[in-house]
């Protein structure tokens, strides 16, 4: 079993924001497999899908982004999953929109959800899929207002195409592992 943890903020006012791209990905995976989310045994929602004999539990923390580690630990404990069987999906302001980066481990890179997960697990050795949200020219204002802002129509087209590739990358990770997925999917959207 693999846990695919999409990061985001739980309130509906954050739907379709750049910061919630992790939720968007697990939502789209659940929809593609005809699954739906229900309450998990902790502060998260879960949906189960099966792909090529691999079971994936899609997880959406019901905590705010900066407390995501609580949900990750609860889901790992309940499903008896080790760090090498999780993939955390989040936004990345340092990557251009339309880009994804898979990593087997690493720092939080300024992403507060990843930071809390690293603190909660006591380790940075878990796979993550970062989805780029940076525009070529960043608009004036705070980074916070940008990441919590909704995608423009043009951005949404790019992100929808990127999410297709991300779904494929997640399924590749589940079947073949992080190294294989990294070799095949670390590129910009065409």
From Swiss-Prot:
Chief location of this protein within or outside the cell: cytoplasm
Database matches in PROSITE patterns: PEPT_TRNA_HYDROL_1 (PS01195)
InterPro entries the UniProt entry points to: Pept_tRNA_hydro (IPR001328), Pept_tRNA_hydro_CS (IPR018171), Pept_tRNA_hydro_sf (IPR036416)
Keyword annotations of the record: Cytoplasm, Hydrolase, RNA-binding, tRNA-binding
Coiled coil, from the record: none
Record CDD domains: PTH (cd00462)
Protein's cellular compartments: Cytoplasm
Any GO MF annotation of the entry: tRNA binding
Residue numbers marked as site, Discriminates between blocked and unblocked aminoacyl-tRNA: 9
Enzyme class per UniProt: hydrolase
Family, similarity comment: Belongs to the PTH family.
NCBIfam families attached to this UniProt entry: pth
Quaternary structure, from the entry: Monomer.
Record protein name field: Peptidyl-tRNA hydrolase
Species for this entry: Chlorobium luteolum (strain DSM 273 / BCRC 81028 / 2530)
